[in-house]
Regions:
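Long amphipathic N-terminal alpha/beta scaffold segment
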Residues: 23-53
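Left-handed beta-helix
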Residues: 40, 45-46, 51-52, 60-61, ...
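Terminal amphipathic alpha-helical/low-complexity segments used for targeting or macromolecular assembly
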Residues: 1-35, 138
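Short, basic/aromatic-enriched C-terminal tail that caps enzymatic domains
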Residues: 134-144
């Protein structure tokens, strides 16, 4: 998934033409094969890995993911429903972040560098650098 996504992301910025069409085709193919919706408009840093082919992952168009991150299956990085409407913001994930299986990170929030997000955690507030966050809603259990 990672290599194909990078090609689609690069081509998605072309205005019209064959490459833009191929970008959408690759995005659709990844959705069908891996049951994921990782937007080619999202910004994903180098050496970031979607484990298990990113099965079930959803990444918002405006999400930013740093370098050297590990994202496991069924992770959602999306906008938050607030006061009867979507807030439109998407998470910004720092460098060297591990996001456990099934974690949900919602809204215009920042997850710092060197953070571990536990499996099935629901993150709706900022998480500082060098922290471990777990639970629903996520709570910081360790600061480095």
């Amino acid at each position: 998934m990672n290599s194909l996504w990078k090609i689609a992301h690069k081509w998605s910025n072309n205005r019209g033409g064959v490459r833009k069409y191929l970008s959408r085709t690759i995005e659709l193919m990844l959705f069908i094969v891996n049951s994921n919706s990782v937007s080619v408009k999202a910004s994903i840093g180098t050496n970031t890995i979607f484990h298990h082919h990113g099965i079930g992952c959803v990444v918002h168009d405006n999400a930013v993911i740093g370098e050297n991150c590990h994202i496991f299956q069924n992770v959602t990085l999306g906008s938050k429903w607030s006061h009867g409407k979507l807030d439109g913001g998407a998470p910004i994930i720092g460098n060297n972040v591990l996001i456990g299986a099934g974690a949900v990170i919602l809204g215009n929030i920042k997850v710092g560098d060197n953070v571990n997000i536990g499996a099935n955690a629901v993150v709706i507030t900022d998480i500082p650098d060098n922290s471990i966050a777990v639970g629903v809603p996520a709570k910081i259990i360790s600061k480095g």
